[in-house]
Amino acid sequence: MNIKVSLLFILPIFLLLLTSKVKAGDIVVYWGQDVGEGKLIDTCNSGLYNIVNIAFLSSFGNFQTPKLNLAGHCEPSSGGCQQLTKSIRHCQSIGIKIMLSIGGGTPTYTLSSVDDARQVADYLWNNFLGGQSSFRPLGDAVLDGIDFDIELGQPHYIALARRLSEHGQQGKKLYLTAAPQCPFPDKLLNGALQTGLFDYVWVQFYNNPECEFMSNSENFKRRWNQWTSIPAKKLYIGLPAAKTAAGNGYIPKQVLMSQVLPFLKGSSKYGGVMLWNRKFDVQCGYSSAIRGAV
């Protein structure tokens, strides 16, 4: 009798824990755009993140020499950022994926043609991924993939994604991720996203009132459901880590945990939460507050 009672008591708890484990999501953060955010190795050692996007390779395309901009952390052109190799390898050794994010909000990148896109892909492969180059801006560390944070330029990103995917067939898994704006479909990345080559997509549900939860929760839900239709493996909600991290779109921690995450977890593609950025997360403790609910 006692055994039966115990089993009846334990089984629901076991099923709850199993469900929680299946639905557990990742936290993704952008690092590299403010020296106030601290070191990359400390970001990884915080235990808060599963993926870190190094931001940004902000100049590329139109057959120009690509340029990395880490906003005061180090000077790439003089080799000052090669010191990050040790940190990158440490992060990877503890299970954290390190991506290079290309693009951002500065008007210094574009893809003028398919050939231009393929050339950029070759540069990324040889300088940050599994290829070889005489001068690698981040040293010999091999990053886990490329993040497309594309807000400007011509829509030749299909060719860029396909060429990177071709390179990725040579050995180590190469992840492709993207951070489109929440209006659906994304005017620059839709074609690339429809190829099915992207592993993770973190949609920026901020700086776009029409699809932000705090502006209109029903529109937010409709947009999320639309985004789940793309052939990506996992879909994430992208949010500012503090009110001051973006013009609008901030969701209070308790609202996210009590109202938003339960809805998102209804999707089989739910992947977790992306935060902009590490500096604001350090200041406001957003990820540490939501970690257990993600």
UniProtKB/Swiss-Prot annotation:
Enzyme Commission identifier(s): 3.2.1.14
Leading EC class: hydrolase
Annotated signal peptide: 1-24
Catalytic residues (positions): E151 (proton donor)
Domain GH18: 25-294
Disulphide connectivity of cysteines: C44-C91, C74-C81, C182-C211
One Pfam family of this chain: Glyco_hydro_18
GO cellular component: extracellular region
Classification via InterPro entries: Cts1-like, Glyco_hydro18_cat, Glyco_hydro_18_chit_AS, Glycoside_hydrolase_SF, Glycosyl_Hydrlase18_Chitinase
Assigned protein family: Belongs to the glycosyl hydrolase 18 family. Chitinase class II subfamily.
Function: This protein functions as a defense against chitin containing fungal pathogens.
Protein name: Basic endochitinase
Species this protein is from: Nicotiana tabacum (Common tobacco)
